[in-house]
C-alpha cells in the first residue's frame, strides 16, 4: 500500500512538472519537459538537452 502511494505521488509530481513554466527557460515561459532548451530549477532534470 505504501509503495502504491509513493508511485501515485511521483506520477502526480512529474505530471505537474511537465506543465510548470520556469522564468529561466529559454524561450521565456516554455514548458520545461517538452523543451529542447536547458531550464533551471525543478524543471532542470526534465530538460531534453542542455547547451
UniProtKB/Swiss-Prot annotation:
<dbReference type="GO" id="GO:0005576">
    <property type="term" value="C:extracellular region"/>
</dbReference>
<comment type="function">
    <text>Probable neurotoxin.</text>
</comment>
<keyword id="KW-0960">Knottin</keyword>
<feature type="disulfide bond">
    <location>
        <begin position="38"/>
        <end position="50"/>
    </location>
</feature>
<feature type="signal peptide">
    <location>
        <begin position="1"/>
        <end position="22"/>
    </location>
</feature>
<feature type="disulfide bond">
    <location>
        <begin position="25"/>
        <end position="39"/>
    </location>
</feature>
<dbReference type="GO" id="GO:0090729">
    <property type="term" value="F:toxin activity"/>
</dbReference>
<comment type="similarity">
    <text>Belongs to the conotoxin O1 superfamily.</text>
</comment>
<keyword id="KW-0528">Neurotoxin</keyword>
<keyword id="KW-0800">Toxin</keyword>
<keyword id="KW-0964">Secreted</keyword>
<feature type="disulfide bond">
    <location>
        <begin position="32"/>
        <end position="43"/>
    </location>
</feature>
<keyword id="KW-0732">Signal</keyword>
<protein>
    <recommendedName>
        <fullName>Conotoxin Cal6.33</fullName>
    </recommendedName>
</protein>
<keyword id="KW-1015">Disulfide bond</keyword>
Amino acid at each position: 500500500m505504501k509503495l502504491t502511494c509513493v508511485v501515485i505521488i511521483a506520477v502526480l509530481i512529474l505530471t505537474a512538472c511537465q506543465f510548470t513554466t520556469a522564468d529561466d527557460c529559454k524561450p521565456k515561459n516554455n514548458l520545461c519537459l517538452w523543451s529542447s532548451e536547458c531550464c533551471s530549477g525543478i524543471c532542470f532534470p526534465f530538460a531534453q538537452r542542455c547547451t
